[in-house]
Structures are given as C-alpha cells and as structure tokens.
Amino acid sequence: MSKSADKILHTAEKLFYENSFVGVGVDLIRDESGCSKTTMYTYFKNKNQLVKSVLEARDEKFRQRLLDYVAETTGREALNRLIDWHLLWFQEDNFKGCLFVRAVAESHLGDQDIISVSKEHKVWIRNLITEYLQSYSKTEMLVEVTYTLIEGLISRFLVEGYDANVAAEIKNSVNQMIDTLNPQSN
C-alpha cells in the first residue's frame, strides 16, 4: 500500500476511534491526512470501503500485538497473558472501547462488509481463547464465560473507568472456574 493510503488509513482510524464513524466525514479525514479527495477516492471508492479497510488494518495490528504479548506461552499461562493484555489496554489514556463493536453499532444492516470484518475479529479472539483452553474439560463453557467476561469489561471500563479490583476479581474468577471444573489442573 502507498504512503498516501497508509496516511489516510492511520488518520481515519485515529479520528474514528476518538470520535465516531458517523461523526467523521471524508472532508475531515482529507484535511487531517493532508491528502486530496481525489487521492482518497483512488484508494477507497467510498466511506464504507474506508471503514472496512480501517477495521482490517486495526485487526491485523491487534492480532500481532496480542500474539507478541502472549508469545512463547501456552494453556493457562497464555490465557492469563491474554487477559493481562486486555487489562493493560483498558488502562490506556485514550481507551474508547472496541472499534469493531462501535462500527457495527453505527453501521446499517446493509453494511455486510463492516459487520463481517467485525465478526471475524471477535471470532478470532474466541478461537484464540479456545486454543488456550483446549486441554481442559468443559472447554466450551470456559471459553464462552471467559470471552463474555472480557467483552463485558470492555463496556464496563469504557463507561465506569478502569477498576483494578474488578479486573483482579475477574481474572481470579476465570482461574477459579478452571480449577473448579478441572481439579486435576491444581
């Protein structure tokens, strides 16, 4: 991808995350990126394609950062690293929740590309949790509860602010649930 396209993507992602998809127009993205409207439309035929491309780029970065953080761990240790990574994200000064959820919330039912990219992102996270918990009994239940707790914390900490006590309780609860359902793992 060209430097101009990268600049447009980076600018659009920043503006969408800080504001909203609906509230940010292509004129603002053009002005902030320093690219012309013609250049924007050379790489992205419309705003929906730009949103989809932003989500795809964000998903790629998200996956790489998370996998780097969890690197060289497996099983429960990897799961705990995955949880820790999310807890660190929730504490960032500019934390605004999940861009994928926000994209779906602001999209129309016909925006299947945006919905599909967002769904793929969430399925990937759930599959990663499944990979880390596959050696435990009641895997499906452990995965669904863990995934739902993480997703719930995204909303909770966005609205209420980060709470270290709640974060620790959730992480401890996940580990206690694994131990309770898998006494041989203690």
Question: Which stretches of residues belong to each language-model region?
Answer:
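Amphipathic alpha-helical segments used for helix-helix packing
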Residues: E92-Q112
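Helix-turn-helix
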Residues: K7, T11-Q49, S53
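Alpha-helical DNA-contacting segments of helix-turn-helix folds
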Residues: V51-R58, R65
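Amphipathic alpha-helical packing segments from all-alpha helical-bundle domains
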Residues: L109-Q134, E144
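Amphipathic C-terminal alpha-helical segment
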Residues: Y147-V166, Q176-Q184
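An amphipathic alpha-helix signature
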Residues: N80, V123-R126, T130, K171, ...
